[in-house]
A protein has these predicted regions:
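Conserved ATP-binding subdomain of kinase catalytic cores across diverse folds
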Residues: 1-68, 113-314
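Catalytic core of tubulin tyrosine ligase-like
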Residues: 73-75, 80-126
Length: 314
């Protein structure tokens, strides 16, 4: 009887212990869910806000075309659009003629020759399309910091009438920095090298990418649309989860470009399966960001001391 009683007590104790443990696990799970709930809600809110901003940026990008550029960069003069002079950012060709040792009357014929040479570098369908347009005006236009020290121009073309504009941008292409360490590119024309590289790497390139030499033939240029519905993301406004997703998309795009232009098997073998390359890129990025800040600090000091001339508020 005592033995039977002991067995019953042990069984009850074990059942009670299991019930207690089950209750504790249930409470712990509920507590974890309560903690996870706000995080999930916050993540969902961030995702919704990111989607809203993306749709807004996409809609804004769709307005960035030649018609928008026309309203900002040109004015109607005697029934014909002319690029507005906004020195030092925009200087029309009529004010640049003397710079190139030309008379104002010589500018348009020279532009036509350049336009003809550029069209010859395009596929037949694009060339045929551009034959519907004629040059109306041109100007030198200062662009981003990445192009400081190089020449950049814009050309206004007109299709069926004055309200059918097309703006093309002409940017100087210099020698690749890799030529100091690697064999020279098989493209002797730097503009062609840039264009062929973009066509190779990008899933969808600008349909009007082409190239020419300058008037003095010593400078190389590539042509593209000034505005073709391009947009940009405001990284500084992104939440951490959105920034992570954006970085992954950029990484995927960059990897795809490398795979299109190189040997994907060799690159995959080089990268391997560990995170050594990831850590190297992270360390390099951090050092590069620090270097940028230091360079900018020296740049500002040079301006303030008068060693470097600069025009502010442009």
């Amino acid at each position: 009887e005592d033995r039977f009683k002991t067995i019953i007590q042990d069984a009850l104790a074990a059942e009670t212990s299991a019930a207690v443990k089950k209750e504790k696990d249930k409470k712990a799970k509920a507590a974890k869910k309560d903690q996870k709930g706000p995080k999930q809600a916050n993540a969902a809110k961030e995702a919704k806000e990111a989607a809203r901003r993306a749709e807004k940026n996409l809609a804004k990008a769709h307005t960035r075309d030649s018609l928008q550029a026309l309203s900002k960069l040109a004015e109607l003069v005697d029934g014909q659009y002319r690029i507005v002079s906004q020195p030092p950012v925009i200087v029309p060709s009529r004010d640049l003629a003397a710079t190139f040792g030309m008379s104002p009357d010589d500018v348009l014929p020279a532009l036509h020759n350049q336009f003809r040479a550029y069209r010859a570098t395009l596929p037949d369908d694009r060339r045929k399309l551009l034959e519907r347009f004629q040059i109306v005006d041109a100007a030198r236009k200062v662009v981003g910091v990445g192009s400081v020290g190089t020449r950049a121009f814009i050309i206004l073309l007109e299709g069926r009438d004055a309200h059918d504009p097309l703006f093309l941008q002409i940017k100087e292409a210099t020698a690749s920095v890799l030529e100091a360490s690697l064999p020279r590119s098989r493209y002797r024309q730097h503009g062609e090298r840039v264009v062929q590289g973009q066509r190779m790497m990008q899933a969808a390139s600008d349909i009007f990418l082409g190239w020419t030499k300058g008037l003095d033939t010593s400078r190389h240029f590539y042509w593209r649309q000034l505005r073709d519905m391009k947009g940009s993301a405001l990284v500084e406004l992104m939440a951490p989860t959105t920034l992570m997703y954006y970085a992954q998309m950029c990484g995927w795009t960059l990897a795809r470009a490398h795979a299109r232009s190189g040997d994907p098997v060799v690159m995959a073998e080089y990268l391997g399966r560990d995170d050594a390359f990831d850590r190297s890129i992270t360390n390099f990025s951090e050092r590069y960001a620090d270097q940028n800040e230091q360079d900018y600090e020296q740049f500002v000091k040079a301006i303030r001391s008068g060693r470097l001339e600069a025009t502010e508020g442009v």
